[in-house]
C-alpha cells in the first residue's frame, strides 16, 4: 500500500515467519502477484569466534528450505551469505548457493559484508561470482576501492545503513552530523543528494 516492494530479511533476524505471514496477506489484500515483490533473505554461515560451528556445504544447501517454509514461498529473489566469517568453509558455502540457484530456489545469489579478498577466493575456485554484495555504504563509509572492484566485476552493490547519520542507531553523542538537515533533501526531486549519490556510484538501497 505504501509502495514498498523489496523486503530484506535474514535467518539471524528471526523474523522470516512474520514476513511470510505479512507478505501472504499483503499480496492477497492488494491484489498483487509474487512477481510484484522482491524478497531477499540470508543464510548465517556460523561464527567460530563466537563458538558457532561453520556451515558445511550440506548445511548451507539445506538452509534454504526452512527459510522458504517460513516465508511461504517457492523461491526467493536473492539469497545471500550473511558474512565471510568461516575462512575454511567460505568457498564450499558459496558452492552450495550456486546449487541452490541451479535448483530454482533462488533467482539470484550473492554475499554480504564481503571484501575483495573474499570474492577473489570465489574467483580462484572457478565458481560463478556473486551477483550482489550487500555492504554498509553511506557518505560516512564510502569504501571507494571496494565499490570500484565490485563495479569492475559486474557485482551489484546493495547498501545497508545507507541513511547514516540519520538512522537512530548511530545517534550517540558526537555521531550526529552537522549536515543532517541537508541530507534530508530526498523525495521526488531528481537533484536530491541521495539520488545523485545513488546514480553516481551505481548503488541501490536494501
Q: Where are the language model's segments positioned?
A:
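Short helix-capping segments at alpha-helix termini
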Residues: 25-35, 71-73, 100-105, 125-129
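Acidic-and-aromatic substrate-binding clefts and catalytic sites of carbohydrate-active enzymes
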Residues: 10-18, 46-57, 85-89, 137-142, ...
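Beta/alpha (TIM)-barrel catalytic core signal, keyed to glycine-rich beta->alpha loops juxtaposed to Asp/Glu
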Residues: 83-206
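Short, acidic/polar
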Residues: 1, 53-72, 90-92, 117-121, ...
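N-terminal binding-site loop/beta-alpha segment at the start of enzyme catalytic domains
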Residues: 1-37, 74, 163-167
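A short, structured active-site edge motif that brings together acidic residues
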Residues: 33-48, 78-80, 84
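CE4/NodB-like, metal-dependent polysaccharide N-deacetylase domain
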Residues: 59-80, 99-103, 124, 155
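Short acidic/polar active-site loop segments enriched in Thr and Asp
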Residues: 5, 74-77, 107, 131
Amino acid at each position: 500500500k505504501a509502495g514498498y516492494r523489496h523486503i530484506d530479511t535474514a535467518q539471524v533476524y528471526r523474523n522470516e515467519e512474520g514476513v511470510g505471514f505479512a507478505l501472504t496477506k499483503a499480496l492477497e489484500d492488494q491484489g498483487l502477484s509474487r512477481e510484484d515483490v522482491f524478497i531477499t533473505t540470508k543464510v548465517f554461515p556460523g561464527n567460530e569466534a563466537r563458538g558457532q560451528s561453520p556451515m558445511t556445504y550440506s548445511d548451507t544447501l539445506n538452509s534454504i528450505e526452512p527459510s522458504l517454509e517460513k516465508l511461504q514461498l517457492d523461491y526467493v529473489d536473492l539469497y545471500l551469505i550473511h558474512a565471510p566469517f568461516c575462512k575454511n568453509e567460505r568457498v564450499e558455502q558459496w558452492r552450495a548457493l550456486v546449487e541452490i540457484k541451479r535448483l530454482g530456489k533462488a533467482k539470484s545469489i550473492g554475499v554480504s559484508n564481503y571484501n575483495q579478498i573474499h570474492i577473489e577466493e570465489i574467483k580462484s575456485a572457478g565458481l560463478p561470482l556473486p551477483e550482489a554484495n550487500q555492504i554498509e555504504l553511506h557518505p560516512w563509509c564510502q569504501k571507494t576501492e571496494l565499490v570500484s572492484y565490485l563495479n569492475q566485476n559486474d557485482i551489484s552493490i546493495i547498501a545497508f545503513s545507507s541513511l547514516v547519520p540519520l538512522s537512530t542507531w548511530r545517534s550517540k553523542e558526537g555521531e550526529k552530523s552537522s549536515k543532517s538537515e541537508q541530507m534530508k533533501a530526498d523525495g521526488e526531486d531528481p537533484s536530491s543528494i541521495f539520488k545523485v549519490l545513488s546514480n553516481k556510484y551505481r548503488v541501490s538501497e536494501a
